[in-house]
């Protein structure tokens, strides 16, 4: 089940109302507004609890998202590029979050650097359509994946620390 910290994080991210994907042009604009509001609230919450860990932006249509996420391990900050497309069947289908710089470096990843979320995250997403959005995918998908995989990859020497301005991987 979900631990107390995750439950608290989840309860602080606004739930979305509009069930629309990129194909529903007019409703998609409303859905995007809700997505941005939830993301802004999630980032504000992270900053206020000193757990800020990603930056995202999208193309004008809101169908391609990209940015940076980071993980702090032994007081060193490891940064990774993050990207994903919004599926045409969104929100019924969750976005597939990719860390292209880690492509091929772990078994818990698909081709192109897409992180494996099938066992735990996707069933939870399916039960919460259309209430979950991008902020929820980051909180329930990418954050736990980073917390499990990055320390392991560092210990194995697969991921190495890079100075500021360089991307880890």
From Swiss-Prot:
Protein name: Ubiquitin-fold modifier-conjugating enzyme 1
PANTHER family, per database record: UBIQUITIN-FOLD MODIFIER-CONJUGATING ENZYME 1 (PTHR12921:SF0)
Keyword Methyltransferase: no
InterPro entries per the UniProt record, alphabetical: UBQ-conjugating_enzyme/RWD, Ufc1
Gene Ontology cellular component annotations, sorted alphabetically: cytoplasm
Protein family (similarity comment): Belongs to the ubiquitin-conjugating enzyme family. UFC1 subfamily.
Top-level division of the source organism's lineage: Eukaryota
Organism: Culex quinquefasciatus (Southern house mosquito)
Membrane-traversing stretches: none
Active site residues of this protein: 116 (glycyl thioester intermediate)
Function noted in UniProt: E2-like enzyme which forms an intermediate with UFM1 via a thioester linkage.
Presence of the UniProt keyword RNA-binding in the record: no
Pfam families named in the record: UFC1 (PF08694)
GO terms of biological process kind: protein K69-linked ufmylation
GO-annotated molecular function: UFM1 conjugating enzyme activity
């Amino acid at each position: 089940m979900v631990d107390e910290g995750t439950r608290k994080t989840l309860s602080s991210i606004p739930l979305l109302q509009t069930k629309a994907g990129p194909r529903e042009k007019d409703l998609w604009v409303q859905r995007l507004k809700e997505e941005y509001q939830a993301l802004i609230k999630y980032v504000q919450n992270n900053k206020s609890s000193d757990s800020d860990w990603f930056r995202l932006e999208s193309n004008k249509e809101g169908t391609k998202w990209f940015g940076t996420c980071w993980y702090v391990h032994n007081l060193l900050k490891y940064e990774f590029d993050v990207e994903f497309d919004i599926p045409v069947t969104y929100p019924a289908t969750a976005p597939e979050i990719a860390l292209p710089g880690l492509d091929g470096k772990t078994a818990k990843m698909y081709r192109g650097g897409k992180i494996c979320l099938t066992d735990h995250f996707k069933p939870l997403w399916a039960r919460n359509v259309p209430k979950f959005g991008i902020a929820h995918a980051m909180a329930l998908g990418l954050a736990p994946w980073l917390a499990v995989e990055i320390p392991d990859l560092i210990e194995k020497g697969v991921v190495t620390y890079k100075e500021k301005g360089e991307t880890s991987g």
